[in-house]
Amino acid sequence: MSQQIIEEIERRYMKQDVPEFRVGDTVRVGVRVVEGNRERVQEFEGVVIRKRGSGLNENFTVRRIASHGIGVERTFLVHAPRVESIQVVRRGKVRRARLFYLRGLTGKAARIKERR
């Protein structure tokens, strides 16, 4: 009984327009950022290296290489109100559920094949 109530409340806060994406896909995440009194959307594009959780607690980690070859990782909740949009840029073909090995690779070695 209490589990049904929890699921009903969670369903109310879940987004409906979340695209289907997997680990290895390159995604562009639009995050709402508040700077002083103004608000803007900041894009963060990179490879999904981890997905975990389910329902309202589902989250994913995106890794990209910033300037001067420094790797930047950000973890997002799929249904968070600050996450405005998630776009799949390209689909990757990987055989792992976690791509933490990409942390040790740079340049062409860190490329992921495209899924057809």
Curated annotation (Swiss-Prot):
GO molecular function terms listed in the Swiss-Prot or TrEMBL record: structural constituent of ribosome
GO cellular component terms given for this protein: cytosolic large ribosomal subunit
Gene3D superfamilies recorded: 2.30.30.790
Pfam families reported in the protein's UniProt record: Ribosomal_L19
Cited PROSITE patterns: RIBOSOMAL_L19
Keywords assigned by UniProt, alphabetized: Ribonucleoprotein, Ribosomal protein
GO biological process: translation
NCBIfam families: rplS_bact
The protein's role, per its UniProt record: This protein is located at the 30S-50S ribosomal subunit interface and may play a role in the structure and function of the aminoacyl-tRNA binding site.
Membership in a protein family: Belongs to the bacterial ribosomal protein bL19 family.
Name of the protein this chain belongs to: Large ribosomal subunit protein bL19
Organism whose genome encodes this protein: Roseiflexus castenholzii (strain DSM 13941 / HLO8)
Encoding gene, per UniProt annotation: rplS
